[in-house]
Structures are given as structure tokens and as C-alpha cells.
Amino acid sequence: MSMQDNSEDLIVRNALLRGDAQARDLFMSNGKYVSSEEDLSASCIRELDAGGKLCIPSFIDPHIHLDKAHTIVSAKSNRSGTLAEAIKIGLELKRNYTSDDLVKRAGQTIVAAVSNGVTHLRTHVDVDNVGGLLPLKAILKARNIYSDIVDLQIVAFPQEGLLKNMGTVDLMWKAMEQGADVVGGMPFSEDSTEESTRHIQIVFE
């Protein structure tokens, strides 16, 4: 028996589900799990053999920085080992960002994540007066390119501060208008407790 010739249908044969001792055949349609049987007699255009390996829901990575991925190859050494120096080094790198390089590095990271079972990512992307909206636009482009294999949520992230880094508040509004999903914050980056408090207030406005 054959199922309808739907290119979105998939049968994964010989897959072990958590808690089961016997491998099963799994039927998926339109990207969603439908049913399983120990020996599914139907056939499908697309079939995979899991080889008796465990089949579980994919993983979620809720905190990643795709705009900074793979920058270690060109970054200076963090001799102090502190967050402050790491941010300073990142700031220097940011001045030389290009859209093509950002998309390439983000893509490498997305493919690596998916190949290891991660299909949902939340990425923070710097928004400030150094890189402007270039990193955001590049990551939005990467999200579109890889939308068939990963769900990517984008956080507009004011790492250099909202008050300390002039113009960032306006850039954050523009980032949300252009496709960022979440407003991020980093009150630590401000110069005083009062400014950190105001930073938090702005994020929730």
C-alpha cells in the first residue's frame, strides 16, 4: 500500500522511541508526527532508516550570538579573561563586520546546530551605534535562507548600553520594526546604577 504522493510526507523506519524496547516506523505529514507502527506496511516517496537509533524531539538553544559566531579566529586574545575585555574585543571586531561574512558565519553555526539535533535557536544580535543595524539585517537574511531547517528567534540586544551608547534607543525601535522578535537588555553596560535602572525601564516601554 502506498500513501498519497505528497512530497511533504516522510516515513522514518526502524526508530526507537524513548521508553520502548522495540523499534517502530514513524509517519510524518507536513512536518508533523502523525502515527507509529512496529511494521508500517505503507510506503512513501521519502523514507529514512533510523537503524534502530533513538528518535526524540529536537533540542532548543535559547541563548546564542550568531553575529559573534566563529569570530575567535580573528579576535585578539582576552589576556585578562574578563567580560569587560571580551566586550572590548568584540567592539573592535564589530567595526569591520560585513553582511556577507555575518551571513556566512551564522549559516555555519546554524548548520552545525541542526546537524547535532538543534532546530530551534534564540539569537541575540547586537544593536548599537558601531555596527548599526548591519548585524541584524544579516541575521534576518540568514534566518530566511535557513528557514526550512531551523526556527530562529531574534533578540535585539543593546550590548553597548542604551544610555551610554548614543542613538541606540532609536536603533532598537528600528530593529523591532525591521523584524527582530524580542527586546533584549544589558543594564550592566551602563555607567551608573541610575542609568542601569533607566535602561531596564526603557526595555519594558
Positions of predicted regions on the chain:
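Divalent metal-coordination and catalytic microenvironments
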Residues: 15, 31, 52, 63, ...
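N-terminal metal-binding scaffold of metallo-dependent hydrolase/deaminase domains
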Residues: 1-43
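Di-metal (Zn2+ and/or Mg2+/Mn2+) metal-binding site signature of metallo-dependent hydrolases
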Residues: 53-75
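Active-site metal-binding motif and surrounding structural segment of the metallo-beta-lactamase
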Residues: 39-56
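Active-site gating loops and adjacent loop-to-helix segments of metal-dependent hydrolytic enzymes
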Residues: 69-102, 179, 203-205
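Divalent metal-binding segments
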Residues: 83-133, 188-190, 194-195
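Hydrophobic faces of well-ordered beta-strands that scaffold small-molecule active sites
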Residues: 58-62, 121-123, 150-156, 183-185
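Histidine/acidic residue-rich metal-binding segments in metalloenzymes
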Residues: 134-148, 164-205
